[in-house]
From Swiss-Prot:
One of its GO terms (molecular function) is translation initiation factor activity. Disulfide bonds: none annotated. It holds the Pfam family eIF3h_C. It is found in: Cytoplasm. InterPro entries: eIF3h, eIF3h_C, JAMM_MPN+_peptidase_M67A, MPN. It comes from Chaetomium globosum (strain ATCC 6205 / CBS 148.51 / DSM 1962 / NBRC 6347 / NRRL 1970). Gene3D superfamilies: Cytidine Deaminase, domain 2. The keyword Cytoplasm applies. This is Eukaryotic translation initiation factor 3 subunit H. One of its GO terms (cellular component) is eukaryotic translation initiation factor 3 complex. Signal peptide: none annotated. Keywords: Cytoplasm, Initiation factor, Protein biosynthesis. The keyword Protein biosynthesis applies. Belongs to the eIF-3 subunit H family.
Length: 362
């Protein structure tokens, strides 16, 4: 069961918890890797707590498995949550679940990710599609690459109310962003995730022997004690943490971080080009207005009818400012990669200091 609670305050939403034991998203995301996998999650709102009871994937169009068609499959899967055919499919699935007495209400959707690379326009459009009808819906992100390291990577997000209002207006200009004080940190609101094990798994974990609490172990008094309580070895520690090689996930994250920084600078260069074009056109308009005022002054001196001074609106056309949304998403993705690199370097730095200590002469 997956639960999410949210309390309403005067200015912001305060998320509480999400817990998940439904393995449909994880299996679907892992089997579809590296293609993006999306699906719907259903449940109910129980006294402010969203309980996720089931999940099912969206049907996708079969394409060739070659590299030339992989991007097409990813694009189709990324746009699946807001496709008309999948909306009808989702409603039909919810109707069937209710027929078998399953608490099934639309509470969000899930998607897969690779090394935290999920903050894009398609993700925003999908979440806005769900959240505009129900502000309690969440986007569940399962990072398959991070989960392959042994620790489940499952995160939940909502769009902030400020970003929802700005996205509804469709204005992401410099003036509107300065007026609303909206930054890239205000795009998403993360909901903490708590994973609950099933009863069978909990029972199995309790059966795993633990190391002795004290160094002195009482000896058995008889042979019957040995037969009744045979010695069980505890779980062995992992020696992979002693590997001195650089984590390949750290290298890949650094590559993705550099790509995001390049995309951010490309968007910044486009905006600077727009500013240069705007300054050039405004200078031409100022020159034209100065010339027209001089002509009108001469015509008034000659007792002639002055020419219209607003004719520049027909002669000149100011360039349209590009949307700053893509730049905000790139900045948010750069922050995401930076946090991942910071998490990786904690263990890498320890290994580097250990190697340095062994290399230095005593």
């Amino acid at each position: 069961m997956c639960r999410a609670s949210r309390r309403r305050s005067s200015h912001l939403y305060v998320p509480s918890q999400i817990s998940d034991k439904d393995q449909v998203p994880r299996h679907h995301c892992s089997s579809s890797f590296p293609t993006t996998a999306t699906g719907s999650i259903v449940g109910m709102d129980n006294n402010g707590v969203i309980e996720i009871t089931n999940a099912f994937p969206f049907p996708t169009v079969d394409v060739s498995g070659t590299d030339s068609h992989q991007s097409d499959a990813t694009s189709l899967a990324a746009a699946a949550p807001r496709a008309k055919a999948n909306i009808a499919y989702q409603n039909e699935m919810i109707r069937h679940l209710k027929e078998v007495n399953v608490d099934a209400n639309n509470v969000g959707w899930y998607t897969s990710a690779t090394m935290g690379n999920f903050i894009n326009l398609s993700f925003i459009e999908n979440q806005h599609h769900y959240q505009r009808d129900n502000d309690k819906t969440v986007a569940l992100v399962h990072d398959v690459s991070r989960s392959s390291q042994g620790a489940l990577s499952l995160r939940a997000f909502r769009l902030s109310p400020e970003f929802m209002a700005a996205f509804k207006e469709g204005k992401f200009t410099t003036e509107s962003l300065q007026k609303s004080k909206l930054t890239f940190r205000d795009i998403l609101v993360e909901v903490p995730v708590v994973v609950h094990n099933s009863h069978l798994l909990t029972s199995f974990l309790h059966q795993i022997p633990a190391p002795p609490k004290s160094a002195e172990i009482p000896l058995p008094a008889s042979l019957e004690d040995i037969r009744r309580d045979p010695a069980q070895l505890p779980a062995h520690p992992s020696f992979d943490t002693l590997d001195l090689s650089i984590d390949p996930f750290l290298e890949k994250t650094c590559d993705l971080l550099l790509d995001s920084i390049e995309s951010h600078y490309s968007d910044l260069n486009n905006h600077q080009y727009y500013q240069r074009q705007l300054t050039r056109e405004q200078f031409k308009i100022t020159q034209w207005q100065t010339k027209r005022k001089a002509e009108n002054a001469a015509r008034l001196a000659a007792k002639q009818q002055p020419l219209p001074e607003d004719e520049w609106q027909r002669l000149f056309k100011l360039p349209q400012e590009p949307s700053r949304l893509e730049g905000m998403l790139n900045a948010r993705q750069v922050e995401q990669y930076s946090k991942q690199v910071d998490g990786f370097t904690a263990s890498i730095t320890t290994k580097m200091f250990a190697v340095r200590g062994n290399l230095l002469p005593e």
